[in-house]
Amino acid sequence: MNKKTVKAIACAAAGWLASAGLAQATIVEVTTNVGKFEINLFDETTPVTVQNFLNYVSAGRYDGTVIHRSVPGFVIQGGGFTFDQQLPLKAISTNAAIVNEPKWSNVRATVAMAKLPNNPNSATSQWFINLANNGANLDVQNSGFSVFGQISSADMAVIDAIAALPRYNFPGIDDLPLRNYSSSDRDDNKPLAADNLITIESVVVVDARSNTAAALSLVPNSAPPPASNDSAGGSLSWLTLLPLGLLLLRRRA
């Protein structure tokens, strides 16, 4: 075996070990330009979804992304786009879609993956945080949305503050939460600055134990889908302008 082969195997093994270690991480800290919050990941019960999320974390792809959608009393959504001094938002590079793991209910303070309509196994990078108990809706749409983490009640203060920000519609994007930006600014078509958007500055692992979710009182999915994972219909839709590729959850009246 030559030196190049040995080196290649060693590098591959090191990468595998790093990935395996990261898969055990169960608490991450998300730092935004308006505050920090932690997500306790359910790696023991939704391993595929958690590993997918951590792959984006380890690659730094969530750093610099923005909260691109906010619907009061429903969800805030992120993990898909960056702002480069002007609209439209730019989509981040995504990995292959993952299998659906709808084990837990979409109750307040849980984090779940967004996905395409009529396709249960289409989640990639985008996620959303439930602002209310949305199980009656999101547990049944599109074979259920995969909840893979939870935010503490204390840290939800940061999430609620984001949800309380005014929202604006722009070409290609609706319900964009902004700070230090007014309706008059929008009427005057004032250009957005980076500081106006809610930006995720970093996502880092802060607790690498594999069982930190064991003490949580998790709520099972209220309507588990059939084993075939057949979709019951349009849970998500593209926004009006397709080039953004923005995933959108449907809120029922």
Which residues does each predicted region cover?
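Short alpha-helical segments used as structural interaction elements across diverse proteins
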Residues: K4, L247-L249
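Bacterial N-terminal signal peptides
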Residues: A10-A18, P243-L246
